[in-house]
Amino acid sequence: MTTIIDGKALAKKINSQTKELVAQLKEKQNIIPGIAVVIAGDDVASLIYTRNKHNKAIKLGINSVLKKFPADVSQAELLAEIEKLNHDDTIDAILVQQPLPPQLDPEVITNAILPTKDVDGLNPLNLGKLFANQHGNYPVACTPRGIMRMLAEYNIDLQGKNAVIVGRSILVGKPLLALLNNANATVTMAGRSTGDLSALTKTADILIVATGVPNLIKATDVKPGAVVIDVGINRLSNGKLTGDVDFEAVKTKAQAITPVPGGVGPMTIATLMEQTVDLAWWRHHG
């Protein structure tokens, strides 16, 4: 019988642990973890997602500051705000919501965030540590961190397994490649333009799809008994949310699969909150 990986339930468990830890930090050490969420523009989906993060932080007892800028904000203005947040002792974590308006360079903006406050784990210093599999305290991209947590929670063995990632983004695909490789999986990365993608995905014991293409992966693209992680979240013309995987068809072949919604999405926010607390702890305790 196929296991449906319940990201919503696991996220609830993580959030409960985070809330308890935040309360203990406040009571015993007078530490209040803080996050600043920065958004530029009026993309509806981004605004909703940003508001959800802000509200979740407040609910867990984290000090959350929402910095909203108009779509025509200059890069200099946004960089000046990030610099202020870098030096703000009440802020442990800085998140810049993407996508950004076209006049802003995501690489420049990301690199301006102090590595020690880079809650998305996208600063080159943090990415370099991840790819080098360095020990120590540094942030890791939240969605990949959440995926690894799900795999661990469901006792999915990665040692020596073939893992295929479809999607090469810096937010998901590339950090996940490093994490899976560090866990001793044999990892292949592909994209939508990969020749004979189906032949490749059918070799996967662990298949992770993050392309933003609704129902890209069909049952015929999946090896029987594979573990399928669907990172995509797409809204169809009828308003229905769907992933990058044809869930109903693929679940008949998979050993385990994440639904959309209720799979990876809740885990991303839960790990964002968890990592904000980590950053606060590391800042005060090294």
Curated annotation (Swiss-Prot):
Pfam families xref list: THF_DHG_CYH, THF_DHG_CYH_C
Listed EC numbers: 1.5.1.5, 3.5.4.9
InterPro entries (UniProt xref): Aminoacid_DH-like_N_sf, NAD(P)-bd_dom_sf, THF_DH/CycHdrlase, THF_DH/CycHdrlase_cat_dom, THF_DH/CycHdrlase_CS, THF_DH/CycHdrlase_NAD-bd_dom
BP GO annotations: L-histidine biosynthetic process; methionine biosynthetic process; purine nucleotide biosynthetic process; tetrahydrofolate interconversion
Binding site for NADP(+): 167-169, 233
Family: Belongs to the tetrahydrofolate dehydrogenase/cyclohydrolase family.
Task of the protein: Catalyzes the oxidation of 5,10-methylenetetrahydrofolate to 5,10-methenyltetrahydrofolate and then the hydrolysis of 5,10-methenyltetrahydrofolate to 10-formyltetrahydrofolate.
Protein name per Swiss-Prot or TrEMBL: Bifunctional protein FolD
Species of the source: Limosilactobacillus reuteri (strain DSM 20016)
